[in-house]
Amino acid sequence: MDARQMKIKAAEAALSHVQDGMRLGIGTGSTAEEFVRLLAEKVAAGLKVEGVPTSERTARLCVELGVPLKSLDELPELDLTIDGADEVDHVLRLVKGGGGALLREKIVAAASGRMIVIADQSKVVETLGAFPLPIEINPFGQVATRIAIEKLAARSGLSGELTMRSSGDGAFMTDGGHLILDASFGRIPDAEALARELNTIPGVVEHGLFINLASLAIIAGPEGARMMQAV
């Protein structure tokens, strides 16, 4: 079973949690896109749902495949969000944002009664940090913000490069018009403390540490999908 097949297995298992009439948060990234494709098949067969996308990319795919969409302002309280992750640990702390949609993903997840994470087994880690941590920043004062993050990292005993994410024609811009610094901190021993400290830096819009948001992770491997519950 290759990586895409494992993503599809996880998405199939997540789809079993979707019920008729649900208001769904729909994530961003390659695994979430497999879920959208499967969801679209169910919608075509008569399933009634309304989705809130976490990115313009996800919105375009949903429109293309016929998944009904609303804005979060129209549906401010959601039943369930299904999204992928770049890393997930044993208590369902996550690193997200590899697809560049971390701010909207976190807003949508927080507006949901439940969040289910879907991923292949390569995303499960003992300690967060091997995947660079995305930090979304305001373009204004970006150098000052970067210095503040570097000082915070040093105080926290973290080292590693901060890399400005780029696209084909320059700096990567999020759907909200922000920049992303990818922080290669390595092992993050206290994710909660780092999350709190990052939130105190004025130029930091959001970060990719998702803590106390996911209630279930569906992890796919060669033997099929397994469930990880929040503890």
UniProtKB/Swiss-Prot annotation:
Disulfide bonds: none
Catalytic residues as annotated in Swiss-Prot or TrEMBL: E105
Molecular function as annotated in GO: ribose-5-phosphate isomerase activity
Amino acids binding substrate: T28, G29, S30, T31, D83, G84, A85, D86, K96, G97, G98, G99, K123
The protein's enzyme class: isomerase
Domain of life per record: Bacteria
Family: Belongs to the ribose 5-phosphate isomerase family.
Assembly description: Homodimer.
Protein's name in the database: Ribose-5-phosphate isomerase A
Native species: Agrobacterium fabrum (strain C58 / ATCC 33970) (Agrobacterium tumefaciens (strain C58))
Lineage: Bacteria, Pseudomonadati, Pseudomonadota, Alphaproteobacteria, Hyphomicrobiales
Name of the coding gene: rpiA
